[in-house]
Structure formats: C-alpha cells, structure tokens
Amino acid sequence: GEEEDVERARLAVTVVAEYADAVRRAGTPMPAGEERLLLDQVTAELVGLGRLQTLLVDTSIEEVHILGCDRVRITRHGGGVDWGEPIADSDAELVEILQAAARRAGATERSLSTSKPTLDLQLPDGSRLAAVFLVSQRPYAVIRKHNTLDVSLDDLAGARADLDEMIDPLLRDFLRASMRAGLNIMVAGLAGAGKTTVIRALMGEIPPDEPFVLLEESRELLPTQHGGRHRAVMSFEAREGHGERGLDGRPAGEVSIADLIPVSLRMGVLRIIVGEVRSREIVPMLQAMTTSRGSMCTIHARTPAGVGERIIELALSHGREMTVDQARRMAGNALDLIVYVTVEDETAIGGRKHRFVSHVEEVIGVGDGNRITTTAVFGPGPDGRAVPRHLPERIRDQLLRVGYDARLLSRWVEAGAGAWRRPRNSRLARR
C-alpha cells in the first residue's frame, strides 16, 4: 500500500545515508551526484518497480517499449527514439517487476499470472502500463507516460510553450462555451493522438464543486491530481474477473464499464465521463447521454469520417438485439459534438510528431438513408489544423444561453482562416 511505500522510501534514505557516511569516514567520500543516483536506485528496488522507476521520473520520455529484459526502446517528446539500459537482469526478473506493479495497482485487483497473462494498469506516477507474457516470445510491456496531468484549454491554445498548440483561440472559446452549455462530446482519434490530453483540458471547464462520475478501465485521467480542482468527482475503475467463468461467459468478480454506467446514473450527477469506449459499453454510454448533459467519452477511429461506423461497430457487439439503424438513431440523439484529434508523424523524414484538433463536427441527427448527419463547424485549414467552416445549427441556442454567439465566427468562416498563434513547422510544408 501507499503507507508501506512511504516506509520503504524512508528506509532507502536511511540506508544510503549510512553507507555514504561510512565511505566518507573511510576517506573516499561519494560525489553528491552518485549519492543521489544510488538513492534513486535503492528506492526503486525497495518500492518494487526496480529500474522502471528511472524511466518514470524522466519527464523527457513519452513512451517506453520493453521487449524483454534487455531491449528498451524509448520514445521522447517530439518523436526522438533511443535505446535504454536493460530493465532487469533476466526475463524472469522482468516478470517479477511487472507482477509487483500489479500488486500495487490500487483499489481494483490486477494480476499477471499463468491464468492471466495480460496486464493493464496505472502506475503510481499516473503512467499507463500494458504487459503480456507466456503467450508472447518474451515478456513485453509498454508504458505510456502522462507528464502533462494539469492542462487547460488555454494551455492547448498556445499559452504553454512546452505543449503542442492543439487548438486556436477561436476553437478554445467554442469548446469552453460547449462545456458551459452541457453539450455531449465524443473525442476521437488514433492511439497516441492526444485524446486524453484534450479530454483533460475539457474536464478543466467543469465547475470545481459540480459532482460528476468518471469511469475508466484503468485510471488515466487522474481528476484528483488535475490541479486539485475537482472536489466532487466520483471515480470508478473497472475490475478484472478471475477464476472460472459463469453462465454468462464472464469470469467471476468482473465489473465492466458497461456494468458501472447504470450505477452512475443513480449517483445524482448530470455528467458521466468514460475514459474510452472500446466495446459493448458504448450502448449504455449513449443511452446515458440521452438523459444527461455535458457527458464525454473518447473513441479510437482512423479518420473523422470513420467515427460513425466505429460507433456502429462497437454498438453491434452489445448483443443480437442491437441493429445498425438502432445504433445510428442512438448516436444521432445522444451526441452533440465529435472532436477529432489528428497526429501526423514526421519523424521518418527528420521531423517530429504534430498533434492538433483537425475537425469539430456538430451532430445534427439521423438523415436520409438513416445515416448520422453532421456539420463541420471546424475543419482542416491549409496546414491541416482546424479553422471555422460552418456556423452551428442545432446547438446554436444552447450556446447563446451561456453567452456565446456563434455568429462571431462568420468572418472567419468567410475568410477560411483560423487564429493559430504559432506556425506548425511541418517539414512537408517546407519542401
């Protein structure tokens, strides 16, 4: 537990201090840098994450691929790649480290074992860890770090030089008003595009005393660390099942996101936020959105045009009673906005990764042919980043009620331009 970790960390300080004092008395004092490094290593071993800890404290790292104990591929912010030192002395030791991480995974039970050879959890620093062994050639793990826990729409609009400018001030003001108006928003994009960052910034617009429910497979959005501003959030985490499967085919003790959504509706909140919809939980999520306001979720989709079909694909996994037409009507009634986040990776040509919002689609409803109908309120400009395209229709009055007049975008729509503060600096644009 957390108290045990604190005690182990104190023990590490004591042990290293006594060792440093002993070598000092022997006439060979340790340089301050070496003493600090030794303390980091001893703390990491005692707390249970071993050499993983040195990767977690390095804020320049974005993602780590552990391909066995001795192959550690490190991706840094901006897309640079290098190879790190071995993470363990053997694959068996690596598995022990991963199992130790699973035991410290917080309130919900996680394990990595012969009966459960995959693992998905949040590490103490907020990073996301996925691991697999036995069914793979060697033990593999991926760590996605979250160095930016406290982020606002202002930050995404260029207020912080250390972050990508993902939106411009026009889109910032539109999204801020959309949150005040209680619109239901789906944030879509590829893995690693920045969906979590965008939804964190949107969460920052929720009043600090407003109760809302946050549902995640493993905790990633971290509202309690989100600047400390969300005092009334109720955070739920799915629980993996273990042992024999019941008559419904599910392992004993499993509690899924789909199970938790009906519970959330009884918690007296207007907003429900699902970290990611990836399966049958999309149906209860959309059902909840039809009776709530200001709810949000993220979804994986390759293209903006593919979001609707992705929704249908997931909805059909809910059961035989769900049809394509039902899924479309449900999405058309539940969603107000779809925000698409794009990532363009230019590292192969000596550039970097660029992350930005490229589309904001207003969901109008279900139109001819029973298709989900949308209007591009913001769409790609000359460099791919979102600029105003059309004035919103269905949500216009809701925005007006919170003091946002969308007609302010008219001149920008006519000009086909946005208000981005910094150039994108794409290598492709310079060719």
Please place each PLM-identified region on the residue numbering.
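Active-site phosphate-binding and catalytic loops of NTP-dependent enzymes
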Residues: G48-V57, A102-L121, E210, H318-D325, ...
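P-loop NTP-binding catalytic core
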Residues: T75-A181
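The conserved Walker
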Residues: M179, L190-A191
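Switch/coupling sub-region of P-loop NTPases
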Residues: L183-I185, A201-G332
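Conserved lysine of the Walker
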Residues: K195
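NTP-binding/hydrolysis catalytic cores, primarily Walker-type P-loop NTPases
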Residues: I349-R431
